[in-house]
Amino acid sequence: MNEAVSPSALSTLFTDARTHNGWRETPVSDETLRELYALMKWGPTSANCSPARIVFIRTAEGKERLRPALSSGNLQKTLTAPVTAIVAWDSEFYERLPQLFPHGDARSWFTSSPQLAEETAFRNSSMQAAYLIIACRALGLDTGPMSGFDRQHVDDAFFAVSTLKSNLLINIGYGDSSKLFARLPRLSFEEACGLL
């Protein structure tokens, strides 16, 4: 039986964690990015389909390629973040299912239904983005996820000759707490949940 994590771990992962818009000038190493993926890849997906593909942008050149796709409110926070992750989904993720889900012919579930394939890829890559955020927090990093960008521009700039489509962006680094806004409220259990 699994044991609950400590209250301090829950604080790190959830209750004390914040979305950051300002960053300290502390780099995030490539080794740390590999550690992040080594954790997040274990999060569950439908039939283990694992459709997320991630591009970690660490260079000024990469940020300049991304700049035209950013909304004005997301520009400065992204250009100053040590890393910006493009979380994308592979529209042909099912080609890896013989390796990832060898228990049956799962590939045919999706080759016979392009709509199901797209819905599955988008939904599950979104879940994997959440796992990435939790992995960042677990390793002492802060994040700033964003959906305010021009997806077509990102796809043209980074994925033009591939089967990848962008889902969201996540800024990653060590946040500057002095630039945080006051904590915003969340919905109560009664407002957001039901019991049947």
Curated annotation (Swiss-Prot):
InterPro entries: Nitroreductase, Nitroreductase-like, Nitroreductase_HadB/RutE, RutE-like. GO terms for molecular function: 3-hydroxypropionate dehydrogenase (NADP+) activity. It is an enzyme of class 1 (oxidoreductase). Induction: Up-regulated by the nitrogen regulatory protein C (NtrC also called GlnG) and repressed by RutR. Pfam families: Nitroreductase. Its EC number is 1.1.1.298. It catalyses: 3-hydroxypropanoate + NADP(+) = 3-oxopropanoate + NADPH + H(+). GO terms for biological process: nitrogen utilization; uracil catabolic process. Its cofactor is FMN. Keywords: Flavoprotein, FMN, NAD, NADP, Oxidoreductase. CDD domains: RutE-like. It comes from the Bacteria. Belongs to the nitroreductase family. HadB/RutE subfamily. PANTHER family: MALONIC SEMIALDEHYDE REDUCTASE RUTE-RELATED. NCBIfam families: PRK05365.1. May reduce toxic product malonic semialdehyde to 3-hydroxypropionic acid, which is excreted. This is Probable malonic semialdehyde reductase RutE. It comes from Shigella dysenteriae serotype 1 (strain Sd197).
